[in-house]
């Protein structure tokens, strides 16, 4: 898909289709009024006849509108003018793209980016239009022998901005939107891959592919032999039951002009399949445990977006690849593990494995002397119960970092909700035999999991994102969502100090 931005009047556009908005009840947007004027009331007459009410998502395709150079005009219902918010705007863009494809338009000039969206500027509207367009066109059929015959002729989309001085902002928005979309696309592709293909080594191979096309990205891996020398016994224990070797992939991006700038570290839980181990999960829905590497998929997607934008910061992405399987060699409930930090953990349940992998990675990244560390993981079902599918759980003892991430989530529409990390919850992890247990019981499960991780993140500013509810969808629309790529990428854009708006 080719995107561009321009500033012009609708009557001068020579395109396959012009897209303009209509408000409820039957009220023309400013651009639609211009078209109505040059067409001598053609559009307003249709509305008076009741052809379109203007309700959100309603579509009316017009052919050969009088005095309009473009072959078609697509009227898009936008709801009530004062109520148009970001959620409705995204839905309208998605419906518009689907309609353009279904009706055979190869190119279009879209004036929806001129609509007033509460609290949003031109940069946001153009970037969100790009991201919504790309997401609506995504499909995963790489492993199907019979590909779907979806009609997708749309090849070029031009977004109109109100003034010429906003062209630079619009171009930047397209650049950023394309990068975020590419990151989400990669995240979804990797996460949707079946576990017989996507194993820890596969994660490493995907990282190397990005490095092949990015001069300032280097990729190294840490295998089981090296982990053993490092004392990463907790990480190793989780993968012990699998024939697939555990692999930790390090993606080091150097974009800062100042070589001494401390790196931001992003850690992704990469359980490419989680059977639960000896504490075996129920069979129903176990196929979705291929998505237990959603955190790593999010990190590799964010790193892809970062490389495409070439942001002037230093970032290290760590993919904690592992597979949790039952076997005679698997770790057991009752085992006591000595972590890389030296702290000991009593295993109460082998299905609380993500934290056992992440705790050693949190210790490992101390060597990078990081500016800050954000780990992202499909860590707990308890977070799904607490927040559902709309918000990721955010945990941090560092208020400025927490606020940065929450703000990035609001900016990108990939929202998070801050959860408590109070000392009282630490008591749930007490063990009579070790420094702590790996399970705090049913109450406050997502919080006690974060409390566990916090014990290994004392030497830097740290935040934890639990994306168990947001990384993938179940049911008829089963598949990766591409989250938290938008949140992580927006956080990096903000950190880089890149100009984003007016």
Curated annotation (Swiss-Prot):
CDD domains: Peptidase_M17. NCBIfam families: PRK00913.1-1 (NF002072), PRK00913.1-4 (NF002074). HAMAP family: Cytosol_peptidase_M17 (MF_00181). Mn(2+) 1 binds at residues 274, 351, 353. Its cofactor is Mn(2+). Its main location: cytoplasm. GO terms for cellular component: cytoplasm. This is Probable cytosol aminopeptidase. Signal peptide: none annotated. Its EC number is 3.4.11.1, 3.4.11.10. Mn(2+) 2 binds at residues 269, 274, 292, 353. It comes from Shewanella piezotolerans (strain WP3 / JCM 13877). PANTHER family: CYTOSOL AMINOPEPTIDASE (PTHR11963:SF23), LEUCINE AMINOPEPTIDASE-RELATED (PTHR11963). Presumably involved in the processing and regular turnover of intracellular proteins. Catalyzes the removal of unsubstituted N-terminal amino acids from various peptides. Keywords: Aminopeptidase, Cytoplasm, Hydrolase, Manganese, Metal-binding, Protease. The gene is pepA. One of its GO terms (biological process) is proteolysis. Belongs to the peptidase M17 family. It catalyses: Release of an N-terminal amino acid, Xaa-|-Yaa-, in which Xaa is preferably Leu, but may be other amino acids including Pro although not Arg or Lys, and Yaa may be Pro. Amino acid amides and methyl esters are also readily hydrolyzed, but rates on arylamides are exceedingly low; Release of an N-terminal amino acid, preferentially leucine, but not glutamic or aspartic acids.
